[in-house]
């Protein structure tokens, strides 16, 4: 994929027919937020509400993410939120490798255009794709990794916390560390 502008990338994503998911999507869920964000949050794929609205993390999981952002004094307007997949898999199943491969260049271009200081993977699927293939979310959440020009970490996916609320304190601690890392990176500029 050639380097694109925001508008070109958005149009390319909206017209994408790179995998079977394009046939069943209501909307391409490109991403939302500050295009100059210091933090990029990356989930795995849109859910039903996201497919209907074309905006990531607007359902119950997104509302929970908003609460965590608020709790650590990070405004949603100051971050960018995207997914690895831009189209919803049927019945919210895990993305297939071929689907990830079809979409990953869109995310790479988003990263290139945003130039975030921190990339936060929301859940194991995003972490396995972006940090390392054998990533174990239960053991490695909140751990920092350096990849290229970015520092990266992963937290539990908000949807997982809705299913298992026992992890909510760990999520809050991870989000506090993200805020602390962001503040330290801003201080070093």
Where are these regions (language model features)?
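A polyanion-binding, active-site-adjacent surface
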Residues: 1-189
């Amino acid at each position: 994929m050639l380097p694109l502008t925001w508008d070109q990338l958005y149009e390319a994503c909206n017209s994408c027919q790179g995998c079977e998911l394009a046939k069943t999507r209501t909307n391409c869920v490109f991403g939302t937020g500050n295009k100059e964000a210091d933090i990029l949050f990356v989930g795995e794929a849109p859910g039903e509400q996201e497919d209907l609205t074309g905006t990531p993390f607007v359902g119950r999981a997104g509302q929970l993410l908003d609460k965590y952002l608020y709790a650590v004094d990070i405004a949603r307007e100051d971050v960018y939120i995207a997914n690895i997949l831009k189209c919803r898999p049927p019945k919210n199943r895990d993305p297939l490798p071929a689907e990830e491969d079809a979409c990953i260049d869109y995310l790479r271009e988003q990263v290139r255009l945003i130039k975030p200081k921190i990339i936060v993977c929301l859940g194991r699927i995003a972490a396995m794709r972006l940090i390392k293939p054998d990533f174990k979310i239960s053991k490695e959440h909140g751990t920092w990794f350096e990849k290229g020009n970015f520092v990266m970490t992963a937290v539990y996916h908000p949807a997982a916390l809705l299913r298992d609320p026992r992890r909510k304190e760990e999520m809050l601690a991870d989000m506090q560390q993200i805020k602390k890392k962001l503040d330290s990176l801003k201080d070093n500029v």
